[in-house]
Curated annotation (Swiss-Prot):
Lineage of producing organism: Bacteria, Bacillati, Cyanobacteriota, Cyanophyceae, Nostocales
Entry protein name: UPF0758 protein Npun_R6401
Gene3D superfamilies reported in the protein's UniProt record: Cytidine Deaminase, domain 2
Location of the motif JAMM motif: 184-197
Organism the protein comes from: Nostoc punctiforme (strain ATCC 29133 / PCC 73102)
Gene Ontology BP annotations: proteolysis
Leader peptide range in chain numbering: none
Domain MPN: 113-235
UniProt xrefs under InterPro entries: MPN, RadC_JAB, UPF0758, UPF0758_CS, UPF0758_N
The keyword Zinc is annotated on this UniProt entry: yes
UniProt GO MF annotations: metal ion binding; metallopeptidase activity
Binding site for Zn(2+): H184, H186, D197
PROSITE patterns named in the record: MPN, UPF0758
Presence of the UniProt keyword Metal-binding in the record: yes
Record's keyword terms, sorted: Hydrolase, Metal-binding, Metalloprotease, Protease, Zinc
Amino acid sequence: MTYCLRIADLPTNERPRERLMTHGAKILATAELIAILLGTGQGPGKLSAVGLGQFILSELGKHQRDPLAVLREVSPAELMLISGVGPAKATSILAAIELGKRAFQSRPNDGTLIDSPLAAAATLSQDLMWQTQERFAVVLLDVKNRLLGTQVITIGTATETLASPRDIFREVIRQGATRAIVAHNHPSGNLEPSQEDIELTRQLLAGAQLLGIPVLDHLILGNGNHQSLREITTLWDEHPQGD
């Protein structure tokens, strides 16, 4: 795609809006999604909307930063420092970002069946997903895996949080839950479990066997994604939960 052409001059099947309507939003490059929000282009060299979208990402990605991570927290003033971005374009981008956050953070109602890592992650998104400090939380379930509630157990630093099996099970028992899913966030967005994550999970599963309160999963959340330790480790084979 040529970034200096007007979108109106592109073949129909190369225009971002038409591509979205035909193929869905997932197929579009990030610059194309931004172009739809911008509506028009300009900036240095009279760029097309797609070209301006690419230029915005390039400017946000300076100093080896992830442009999407910057975009999540950018202010209107910071966006308007980029050539070609005025108040109208900046507010359109920021409104779309906030709408996406709110849609992702919308949590199920109590009583909802939590039957997958995705469903569990959705219940914890508001508490964990976009936080800049590590947090450890628990999803509280009844015997049929229906949601009773969620609870943040601890709040740590940007790189670590501390949670003990005793504190976690105390909260589960206090709230009358019979099953639980534990989770914490990695503000960096790296969802790989640390050795400490693995060891804590092992302790929780062993404790769950003694107490008769199954721990169904341990999730790591961050930057809009999640990872299930149950899916990527053998810990549940080593410590069956009877679920």
